[in-house]
């Protein structure tokens, strides 16, 4: 797991710039073809702010690390209600604005570890069967 400096939201508040800098190794520099998700919060959105960041999902070793980074990004809120406002390069069936649970996160990681041909085959499998289980796909793909 990458070393992170996570601070309590009750400690001195960081500026938004400092919050992004504190998780900068996870932030996408240029959006092209890497799997990523834009993480904001409902509070900021409801206050008229789209503050957040595109997070490169390839950078995370675990769901816990992902959630820690999302919370660090929004450390100015005591208990941030995360809002995933956009996504790219993973199946739409797994995207949800309001949450990403560990099961979905693990599916996305397994998907992005596939080579391009296997990803295309998986998408065709899901389209044909409606089954987005990677283990079922792999049983049929081999």
Language-model segments: which ranges?
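Acidic interaction surfaces
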Residues: 1-142
